[in-house]
């Protein structure tokens, strides 16, 4: 059906969302939001509609099914997500993020034409990249969503019920406590605060709407009043502080505004009611990923904004990590309503470019745990929207025989002392060059991400075999090229730690300048990596350095240049192990003395949960405890070492009183001893060991003081 455009606007896309299905017309409707250029409005939108063929229509679920706190309409979400790949406009909007589009729409805001600004032909018929024109992207408008609730688990492993698992040793496959916890959860005492640049909306349960009118009339929204503490574990998260003075109190209608539109199609018409927010991005506190508040708030908001509406309402469809069998690295996903991105990380300024093309965790990434996306080309389309399937296959075959698996970890045994494969010490003055291949490998896959290591981990877990092979080939092409260059430049490789490569040279290096080293590397690598991607992450002269293979899957690195201020490496206890290794490079290293040097940092962070979190490898051999909340649905799940073993935890929860500081101190000492032990074993003499044990007890007492 030909549609005549009456609105022509330009802008950068913010997101594509599923609106609903118009069953009478067999039409799927998407909502596309964008930041318009050259206009006073901060946000604009259009609808993309598509008729569904018989084959696809027969696969549409009859209904969204019964909603839970962690999942609503997952089969409908998967169905519509698969349809996106067959729509050229949707594919362009999701795959060419950061470009300015020209939107042509009819009177009902239905898209009738789309092209990248600067291209002659519309999407689907043109090539080449679009120009920026006079568009100057500004920082998007933020909102912060803070929620608290009390959760009680009557039949799961939450709270004290988790103690029943305390005797199970950590071995084999990791336990997943959240499954039982979310089967029967009771939520109460809900408090919600939304802060924007205009003011603050608050919905403390049962307040009668004094602070805000609530998402559902005067009942305050969802839940009743209470202290907001989670059952079995307190929360350290707090809403961000605003400017001085009393902030403006907002009502829910100040934040969300329904807009009525009419869609005409083949002699039929239907009314639509999208809801426009007073912001572009919502940042939620981490607890909102498991405390059940966010879905209920949006459910009440949708009910309020569509009350007495006789048209086709938006669909509220979502999936949370707790709805995935193994949990997820990806955050919760709202496929449609409320039509903006919800991010579960510290709030910061972002642009439209970042939201569409720069975010490490693409919208809908959590769907990759479900068929038909899991390890399929559909998953690749979500992970790498800018890379075609045939291009992925070509790159998968480009590497030939791969010598290293993705994320290899090893030391150069040719440089290790006899009898040791886990320790490498360079005692003489040398140049140390540290390279990181992750960003270049991601760029070879067409992925522009902030955390390339995390992105590659998601490829390993959820990508297709072709995408995994393409990533492995890119990694091997880079690694073999780097090692070839190193041999020619007089460097020897000392260690490979996943994407990091450590090169040492006791001879005169080709240059003392890191930029010249980078240029020499690029010239050697040829056409493999794309331009403008840095490889050098560190370069300098060292009097000595040490590399230790620890827990079989990580390399700890100590450098003499870090001796002047070892605590600067201690952003976490895990990082303190590198600082401890640096301290073994002194003239007369003493284990107890090294521990004493680290104590100021340990003491300063003794109440900070995030500082003491470790991955599961550090909990090996200790009895495992369930978390007080279903936080293990967020993968990979970190742990705390406690008196009864190890407990799965989250940085948003307060540090428990039974943290086993002695276990952390002992692990630090073990690391130091391994770096100092001579080939063939041996250890401290009796007097030195007694002194170390005495210091261990003393330091444990200091850290345990409130």
UniProtKB/Swiss-Prot annotation:
<dbReference type="GO" id="GO:0016787">
    <property type="term" value="F:hydrolase activity"/>
</dbReference>
<keyword id="KW-0067">ATP-binding</keyword>
<dbReference type="GO" id="GO:0004386">
    <property type="term" value="F:helicase activity"/>
</dbReference>
<keyword id="KW-0235">DNA replication</keyword>
<comment type="function">
    <text>Component of the helicase/primase complex. Unwinds the DNA at the replication forks and generates single-stranded DNA for both leading and lagging strand synthesis. The primase synthesizes short RNA primers on the lagging strand that the polymerase presumably elongates using dNTPs. The primase-associated factor has no known catalytic activity in the complex and may serve to facilitate the formation of the replisome by directly interacting with the origin-binding protein and the polymerase.</text>
</comment>
<keyword id="KW-1048">Host nucleus</keyword>
<comment type="subunit">
    <text>Associates with the primase and the helicase to form the helicase-primase complex. Interacts with the origin-binding protein. Interacts with the polymerase catalytic subunit.</text>
</comment>
<dbReference type="InterPro" id="IPR004996">
    <property type="entry name" value="HSV_HEPA"/>
</dbReference>
<dbReference type="InterPro" id="IPR008650">
    <property type="entry name" value="Helicase-primas_cplx_Herpesvir"/>
</dbReference>
<dbReference type="GO" id="GO:0019079">
    <property type="term" value="P:viral genome replication"/>
</dbReference>
<protein>
    <recommendedName>
        <fullName>DNA helicase/primase complex-associated protein</fullName>
    </recommendedName>
</protein>
<keyword id="KW-0347">Helicase</keyword>
<dbReference type="Pfam" id="PF03324">
    <property type="entry name" value="Herpes_HEPA"/>
</dbReference>
<dbReference type="GO" id="GO:0042025">
    <property type="term" value="C:host cell nucleus"/>
</dbReference>
<feature type="compositionally biased region" description="Gly residues">
    <location>
        <begin position="217"/>
        <end position="236"/>
    </location>
</feature>
<keyword id="KW-0547">Nucleotide-binding</keyword>
<dbReference type="GO" id="GO:0005524">
    <property type="term" value="F:ATP binding"/>
</dbReference>
<keyword id="KW-0378">Hydrolase</keyword>
<dbReference type="GO" id="GO:0006260">
    <property type="term" value="P:DNA replication"/>
</dbReference>
<dbReference type="Pfam" id="PF05774">
    <property type="entry name" value="Herpes_heli_pri"/>
</dbReference>
<comment type="similarity">
    <text>Belongs to the herpesviridae HEPA family.</text>
</comment>
<feature type="region of interest" description="Disordered">
    <location>
        <begin position="203"/>
        <end position="249"/>
    </location>
</feature>
């Amino acid at each position: 059906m030909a549609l005549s455009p009456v609105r022509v606007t330009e802008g950068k896309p913010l997101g594509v969302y599923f609106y609903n299905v118009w069953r009478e017309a067999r039409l799927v409707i998407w909502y596309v939001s964008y930041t318009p250029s050259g206009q006073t409005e901060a946000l604009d939108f259009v609808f993309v509609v598509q008729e569904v063929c018989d084959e696809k229509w027969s696969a549409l679920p009859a209904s969204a099914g019964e909603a839970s706190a962690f999942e609503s309409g997952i089969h409908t979400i998967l169905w519509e997500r698969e349809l996106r790949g067959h729509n050229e406009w949707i594919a362009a909007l999701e795959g060419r993020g950061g470009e300015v589009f020209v939107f042509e729409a009819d009177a009902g805001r239905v898209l009738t034409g789309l092209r990248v600004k600067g291209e002659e032909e519309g999407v689907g018929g043109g090539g080449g990249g679009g120009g920026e024109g006079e568009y100057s992207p500004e920082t998007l408008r933020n909102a912060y969503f803070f929620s608290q609730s009390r959760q009680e688990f009557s039949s799961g492993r939450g709270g004290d019920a988790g103690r029943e698992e305390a005797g199970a040793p950590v071995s084999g496959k990791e336990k997943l406590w959240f499954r039982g916890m979310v089967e029967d959860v009771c939520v109460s005492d809900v408090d919600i605060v939304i802060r924007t640049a205009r003011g603050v909306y608050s919905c403390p349960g049962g307040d009668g709407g004094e602070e805000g009118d609530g998402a559902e009339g005067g009942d305050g929204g969802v839940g009743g009043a209470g202290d907001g503490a989670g059952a079995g574990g307190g929360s350290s998260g707090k809403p961000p502080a605003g400017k001085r003075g009393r902030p403006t109190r907002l009502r829910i209608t100040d934040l969300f505004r329904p807009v009525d539109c009419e869609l005409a199609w083949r002699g039929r018409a239907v009314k639509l009611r999208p809801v426009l927010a007073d912001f572009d991005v919502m940042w939620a506190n981490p607890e909102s990923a498991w405390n059940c508040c966010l879905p209920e708030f949006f459910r009440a908001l949708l009910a309020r904004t569509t009350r007495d509406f006789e048209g086709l309402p938006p669909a509220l469809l979502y999936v949370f990590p707790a709805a995935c069998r193994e949990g997820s690295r990806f955050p919760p996903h709202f496929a449609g309503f409320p039509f903006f991105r919800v991010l579960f990380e510290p709030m910061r300024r972002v642009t439209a470019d970042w939201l569409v093309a720069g975010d490490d965790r693409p919208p809908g990434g959590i769907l990759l745990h479900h068929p038909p996306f899991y390890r399929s080309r559909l998953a690749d389309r979500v992970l790498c929207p800018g890379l075609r399937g045939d291009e992925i296959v070509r790159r998968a075959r480009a590497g030939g025989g791969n010598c290293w698996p993705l994320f290899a970890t090893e030391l150069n045994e040719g440089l290790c002392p006899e009898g040791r494969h886990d320790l490498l010490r360079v005692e003489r003055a040398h140049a140390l060059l540290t390279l990181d291949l992750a960003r270049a490998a991601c760029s070879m896959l067409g992925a522009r991400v902030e955390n390339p290591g995390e992105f590659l981990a998601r490829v390993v877990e959820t990508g297709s075999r072709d995408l995994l092979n393409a990533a492995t080939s890119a990694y091997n092409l880079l690694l073999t090229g780097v090692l070839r260059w190193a041999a020619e430049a007089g460097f020897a490789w000392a260690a490979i730690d996943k994407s990091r490569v450590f090169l040492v040279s006791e001879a005169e290096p080709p240059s003392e300048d890191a930029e010249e080293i980078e240029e020499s590397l690029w010239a050697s690598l040829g056409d493999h990596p794309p331009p403008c991607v840095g490889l050098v992450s560190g370069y300098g002269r060292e009097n000595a350095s040490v590399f230790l293979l620890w827990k079989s899957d990580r390399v700890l690195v100590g450098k003499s240049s870090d001796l002047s201020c070892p605590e600067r490496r201690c952003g976490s206890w895990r990082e303190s192990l590198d600082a401890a290794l640096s301290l073994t490079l002194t003239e007369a290293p003493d284990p107890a003395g090294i521990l004493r040097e680290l104590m100021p940092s340990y003491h300063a962070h003794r109440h900070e949960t995030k500082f003491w979190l470790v991955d599961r490898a550090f909990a090996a051999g200790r009895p495992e405890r369930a978390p007080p909340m279903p936080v293990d649905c967020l993968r990979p799940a970190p742990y705390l070492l406690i008196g009864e073993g190890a407990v799965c935890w989250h940085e948003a929860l307060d540090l428990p009183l039974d943290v086993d500081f002695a276990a952390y101190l002992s692990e630090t000492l073990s690391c130091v001893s391994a770096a100092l032990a001579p080939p063939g074993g041996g250890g401290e003499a009796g007097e030195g060991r007694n002194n170390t044990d005495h210091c261990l007890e003393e330091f444990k007492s200091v850290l345990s003081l409130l």
